[in-house]
């Protein structure tokens, strides 16, 4: 895995947030390590008065306690918004037979609406909390948790976010907890992805950054080729999530000025 100069990485993120978020930022705080890390960095960069955290549970669990812990340790303003009645009303009016994943996407997009409503009313921007591991594999909801104005940790792998979190003082219980998108009870990222972040990041780094072939990656890591191919498939299938919508080109059909 690549080795970063973490002190300089942290300083660069702080400079980035100061430049982009000078008027203030709004962050969705889930109780997980990614959002906690962004909240800590934003508070260090801008001061607590310029950071608003939104905690938006669909159901009450320990994540809400962890999210509150982050906000209260930082001394930032925060709001707890129960999105269950909003989501349930929306689903009821859709009159569709949604599966668990479909419901999860609506939860995520509801949170996005909340974030932007608050940001717009305050003249602030939304800071995203996606990391590189999620971004490359498409492990996010399009126009949901993947939506933000700026994303300070999007070029850091999950394992690198863990390292930064430890260095900047994110509570240990948050750093060590199993990552979860909080879309249903007992849901974890690694169960859904079918691979640990430690191994996923090793594969992604070799495949994307170093451009190493699949067979060599499998041999290098001592894992089945099928696992490397599964990661490659996740990247390919989620390509549309990493760009704005595109349409057909008509440049070759121009017949006049």
UniProtKB/Swiss-Prot annotation:
Gene3D superfamilies assigned to the protein according to its UniProt record, in alphabetical order: HUPs
Catalyzed reactions = deamido-NAD(+) + NH4(+) + ATP = AMP + diphosphate + NAD(+) + H(+)
Provide the GO biological process annotations. Answer: DNA topological change; NAD biosynthetic process
The EC designation for this entry is 6.3.1.5
Q: Which pathway does this chain act in? A: Cofactor biosynthesis; NAD(+) biosynthesis; NAD(+) from deamido-NAD(+) (ammonia route): step 1/1
| Keywords tagged on the record | ATP-binding, Ligase, Magnesium, Metal-binding, NAD, Nucleotide-binding
Enzyme's top EC category: ligase
What residues bind deamido-NAD(+), as annotated? 109, 142, 149, 240-241
> Where, by residue number, does ATP bind?
28-35, 129, 158, 180
This protein's source sits in the domain of life called: Archaea
- Gene Ontology CC annotation, any one: cytoplasm
Residue positions binding Mg(2+): 34, 134
Disulfide-bond pairs as recorded: none
Q: Which GO terms describe its molecular function?
A: ATP binding; double-stranded DNA binding; glutaminase activity; metal ion binding; NAD+ synthase (glutamine-hydrolyzing) activity; NAD+ synthase activity
Listed InterPro entries: NAD/GMP_synthase, NAD_synthase, NH(3)-dep_NAD(+)_synth, Rossmann-like_a/b/a_fold, SASP_alpha/beta-type_CS
Q: Which NCBIfam families match?
A: nadE, PRK13980.1
Q: Which HAMAP family match?
A: NadE_ammonia_dep (MF_00193)
**What is the protein's quaternary organization?**
Homodimer.
Q: What family does the database annotate?
A: Belongs to the NAD synthetase family.
Q: What does this protein do?
A: Catalyzes the ATP-dependent amidation of deamido-NAD to form NAD. Uses ammonia as a nitrogen source.
**Know the name of this protein?**
NH(3)-dependent NAD(+) synthetase
Q: Which organism is it from?
A: Pyrococcus horikoshii (strain ATCC 700860 / DSM 12428 / JCM 9974 / NBRC 100139 / OT-3)
